[in-house]
C-alpha cells in the first residue's frame, strides 16, 4: 500500500513535469530489490519520461521477451471538484480513492510489486521480461512512439501485454459482455 500511496501523491498530469521524478523513484525500488543498474533505463522526453526495466531470463525458452506496458501519468484533477483530495491515497473498508487508483497507478504499482517479488524470490524467467512505463498516455502518447522508434532494442518483444485501467459492461446475470 505504501508504494501506491507514494504513487498517488505524485501529481503526474501533463505539464506538471513530475513524471521523471516518479520514474526515478520506481527505478530506486527496482534497484533496492536487486535489479542491476544496467537493467534500468530512464528515457527523457520533454517534461516527461519513460522507464524501461529488463528482467533478464536464462534464455532457455529460445524466445523473444514479453513486454509489459503501462503508464505513469494521470489526467489532471482539480482538488476543489473532488470529495476527497485526489493526490492523497484514502481508503475505506472497500475501496481505495485517489487520482490514478484506477488509471493507472494501481497497475504500475502492481507490476512493480510483482517484479520485485519475483526478483527477491530468486525467480529466473526462461526469457527476458520487459516493463515499459511511459509518461504521456493521457495526452499525446509520444513516449510510446519514442520507445518504438528510437529505443526499439529496449522494448522489442515477441508480444506485449498492456496493463492499463479500463472497464466493462455486465449483463443482468453479471456476465461480462464488453471490455474497454
Each language-model region and where it sits:
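Acidic/histidine-rich catalytic neighborhood of metal-dependent amide-processing enzymes
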Residues: 95, 102-180
